[in-house]
Amino acid sequence: MLVVLFTAVLLTLSYAQEPGDELQILDQTPNQKPPPPGFPPRPPANGSQQGPPPQGGPQQSPLQPGKPQDPPPQGSPQQKPPQPGKPQGPPPPGGPQKKPPQPGKPQGPPPPGGPQKKPPQPGKPQGPTPPGGPQQKPPQAGKPQGPPPPGGPQQKPPQPGNQQGPPPPGGP
């Protein structure tokens, strides 16, 4: 595939260079020939040649832009240099389809569970409620949950200024 494209590009470049060279030669040759003897010299009018036309005259006129000269080279109308933005020959695999992903739009299939996975609303449980759901509330502040631990309310953190336990050695 690449070899075919490469050779097509090389042929196109070589054919594109040759008619340009012939165009320069044809532009110079009619003006360089002196008029044949017996004809009064005339200034050449625009677009006309001086003297009799060369052999096969009307066919060998200077290249008109956009018109092939003589028999066109083999396959020349098909082998034009690629226009910018248009692929030459078959497009590369996946070529025009590969577009950069639009921001915010997922490319290809969405990830498993994609749009269905919404963040849970605050205060609302997601999915089925746990067994005994509404009854299981976090304990209210100030109310012990279940039986209080042994000696529960008596175990308070030491108040500042009150020493708990024996005083450290070296005290008063």
From Swiss-Prot:
UniProt keyword Signal, yes or no: yes
Chief place of localization: secreted
InterPro entries documented for this protein: Pro-rich
Composition skew (Low complexity), residue ranges: 57-67
Cellular component per GO, a single term: extracellular region
Region entry Disordered, spans: 22-172
Pfam families listed in its UniProt record: Pro-rich
First and last residue of the signal peptide: 1-16
Subcellular location as annotated: Secreted
Protein name as annotated: Acidic proline-rich protein PRP25
Organism, as annotated: Rattus norvegicus
